[in-house]
Amino acid sequence: MKMNLAEVEIRILGCLIEKELTTPENYPLSLNTLTNACNQKSNRAPLMDLAEADVVRGLDKLGARGLARLTTTGGRVAKYRHSLDDSLHLAPPALAVLAELMLRGPQTAGELRNRAERMTPLADIASVEEILGALMEFGPPLVTRLPRQPGRKEQRYAQLFAGEPDLPDDTPAPPPEPARQRVMAENERLARLDGEVSALRAEIASLRSTIEELRVLFE
């Protein structure tokens, strides 16, 4: 099932998972608490400034996909929870890794280990790589490994709930063919000549103006 969730929906889902793991005593979340979590300044990239109406619309779309639901158990205030543990049957470590990818975008296994530990214990980078491998083998995959960036040793991983990530084209352009190089050189030479001709014409016009002024003076 291809999800192609919008950025706001990804943020909501990541926040619901994060708060379930970090503050279970306050979970599920009220609309106000969830909105504040979405707009949180720490552990978020990019930063957002969502209104409650934006969050409601996102929750409705997630609910239609079976990824979030409303609950009023134990109180009068409507509260919201995610449904990934029900639909995907993921353990807390896998949920924490997914939440971190949703909240901060593509990251290396080392970055995920350091940042997701606030949600659940992660023994080492190898255990995170094992989790990522399982998420990549999910049907359909929930995570993908991105091509290594120029100048970086480690590869990054991205969640696929928003579809395939847009990647910058880091492939260097091939060198121009000899014929094109000759044409480019000729074009540059002609451009220089045009500039020189224009400068000479301006000088001639200035000289003519000066001569005319002198002629008027001596008449």
Curated annotation (Swiss-Prot):
It comes from Geotalea uraniireducens (strain Rf4). HAMAP family: UPF0502. Transmembrane segments: none annotated. Belongs to the UPF0502 family. The lineage of its organism: Bacteria, Pseudomonadati, Thermodesulfobacteriota, Desulfuromonadia, Geobacterales. InterPro entries: DUF480, WH-like_DNA-bd_sf, WH_DNA-bd_sf. This is UPF0502 protein Gura_3445. Residues 162-181 are annotated as: Disordered.
